Amino acid sequence: MLKKCLFPAAGYGTRFLPATKSMPKEMMPVVNKPLIEYGVEEALQAGMSDICIVTGRGKRSLEDHFDVNYELEHQISGTNKENLLSDIRNVMGQCTFSYTRQHEMKGLGHAVLTGQTIIGDQPFGVVLADDLCITLNGPGVLAQMAQLYKQFRCSIVAVQEVPANEVHKYGVIAGQYISDDLIRIEDMVEKPTKKDAPSNLAIIGRYILTPDIFDLIHDTQPGKGGEIQITDALMAQTRRGCVMAYKFKGERFDCGNIDGFIEATNYCYNNFYASSSEKTVNRSWYR
């Protein structure tokens, strides 16, 4: 059963400087909620209540966010502002949080490997918080993938079609279609050129991984820039067995860049806040 979810969150967030000079990019607020909280809510909806966050230097606010602030609680006690904390209280009440540090930035594969001691020998989810996924009707993206895992018991990556001139930003897959939205992966290339891309199906920041991925990452040689890519380990897993790609239902916003972040903010405001005249109302999307 899927209970654990890993959040790689040690990166510098340089595309959002100077804001991220003193604030983790995962704490950037979309309307009034930080990106990391949206991701944890999505994991919780999928049944993953054991949250492991891979942090780094200057990321202490991630830990503080999922903790009680007694001074603040006392200050707003008995006022209508108490309701503004209802979502985070619910998350804190249902999740356990563990933290481990990634001392060197060596790619997503290395970040996942850093969480091995906490994850252990269990299948687990991975959420990249700067990929904000919203599903207005029905289960969230990770919950959709968790249902598929019950059937296939293998690693699964979320994918979406991207323009051909953007494939160089992503890991790109190709394979055999099992259904309209499910592909058995046969090829996978990290950040290919337009010419070399096997398709326009790009991996986004949602994964379900089986625990044998750790040994495969450990055996993966660093590539460009000394980074260990998760796609290399997944391709090795494909050769040994099966890895699925899933074309998810819902909206995805790349909040790792300013345009995507603004689009996400407008979307969330219009769908969760604009219809309410009282902005202190609870607007958790994931229930």
Role assignments for model-derived ranges:
Residues 2-81, 138-140:
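N-terminal glycine-rich phosphate-binding loop and ensuing alpha1 helix
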Residues 125, 138-142, 146-150, 177-254, ...:
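Catalytic-core segments of class I nucleotidyltransferases/pyrophosphorylases
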Residues 64, 72-75, 82-172, 209, ...:
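Conserved beta-loop-beta/alpha segment of the NTase-like Rossmann-fold superfamily
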Residues 59-61, 132-134, 252-254:
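Short, active-site-adjacent cap segments at secondary-structure transitions
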Residues 4, 49-51, 123, 154-155, ...:
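Residues at the starts of beta-strands that form the adenosine-phosphate
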Residues 35-38, 110-114, 233:
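Well-ordered alpha-helical segments embedded in enzymatic catalytic cores
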